[in-house]
């Protein structure tokens, strides 16, 4: 089991629930836009947020951003150790650094000293795209073994400076390399692990890669925080992360929507209806399964494993509860009838 690490008002590791992270895509210097996006992501289920800090103005903006948000803010630092120090001085709850790209050991120590003074966790990040040349040569290419050695070397560097309030992340866009790296490092450290497939891609490819990679890693009991990296709206990352955790049985809550793939018997616009249902239930705080079926012939039977379902017909639809037809309603009222049942579920 990994050690516990406190990040602002959240605790990770030590068997605590796996938390969902995302990253803002606003300019961090724009306080209002960044805070607004963080609050939107928080409402969707984000637990920890990371912000890019490429400038001193961005580091200073964290102080005002922190006043407007409720979840921990992680400062993402590259190259300039002074930005890491400024970010911590302005309220960052955690910093993410790659000690290999912020300069000499003295500069790393300057960052570690401030982190130690304020008890701010450091996430040590290693990425397959920036693996050290000597490790590439040693392992004849970028490999899981090289990534793990790089990460553990950087962890030891900081531990030797007298600080061990650390989180480790190993990222690769190669899904199976990423899986192997996590399997290797999990047996060699008790620091919490942040898990994600980097540069996963657009919504479709990114979701598939992340679901496979994170699924294989998390199913082995590895991982304390996750991010689904997508080229798109960060809100999509939260939706996907929640579904991955729920599918693996690692998080409860939230309505699960299942729907049939459509066939020649489909008598309604099922694709539109399923999307409408998915959007409708996003903010309903129930831990149930909802089925959306395309015909009244197979609908009741196929929806049997769901808590509630709907099936469309010609001009009318069925509301199905626990596999039994509960009521018939006009097709035009099907969505609203389902909404009513969900909002009054516990009555």
Regions found by a protein language model. Name each.
Residues 25, 30-31, 42-65, 96-104, ...:
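Glycine-rich, proline-tolerant flexible connector loops at the mouths of alpha/beta enzymes
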Residues 127, 135-282:
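Catalytic alpha/beta core domains of metabolic enzymes, predominantly
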Residues 82-123:
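Hydrophobic or amphipathic alpha-helical targeting/insertion segments
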